[in-house]
Amino acid sequence: MEVLKEMIDMLVEQATTVRKEWSAVCDSVIHEKPKFIKRTRDKMWFSNLETISEILEVYHFTTLKYIEDDNTITLSLNEIDLIENGRNEQEARLNMGKAILDYALEYYNEYQMYSRSPNRKKHIPYIFKALIIDDPEKIGDMLQCQNGKN
């Protein structure tokens, strides 16, 4: 266990070094690999958006789809408690994409509160996925829909 800790410590760059060599560190993160950074007892991770997008690739937005009595479509998001309706599936998907992105922005703006709430902590990967995509139409198009039971 101690050997593993020493190996991990070898990967960590000190914050003072990062500050002094900021431009070189940024270039390295963008073109080479992420960095682990330590400031006193705090540890953090610095990467480009491509890397975090790859990590988040395993997270999917899934919905249950309901056909209402008026033939509109309602989508219920499984990962986050969001429900949206539209005249057809495409409109419902777009509405859900907008709702996901709106929630992601609110979550990020109130990150300290939301990320510490036990029922919302698991939303973190979905929040960052939505913020990185930053396009309600793309988010709506990537929804994986299954038929729900009315």
Predicted regions span which residues?
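A short, exposed loop/beta-hairpin motif centered on an aromatic-Gly-Thr core
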Residues: 78-90
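Polyanion-binding surface elements
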Residues: 9-20
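Short aromatic-glycine-(Arg/Gly/Cys) micro-motifs in beta-strand/loop hairpins
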Residues: 59-78
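Short, charged, surface-exposed hinge/linker loops at domain edges
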Residues: 3, 8, 23-63, 94-150
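Generic structural signal for individual residues within well-ordered alpha-helical segments
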Residues: 19, 90-93
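N-terminal pre-first-transmembrane soluble regions of secretory-pathway and organelle membrane proteins
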Residues: 1-3, 15
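Conserved short-loop catalytic and cofactor-binding motifs
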Residues: 6, 10, 77-80
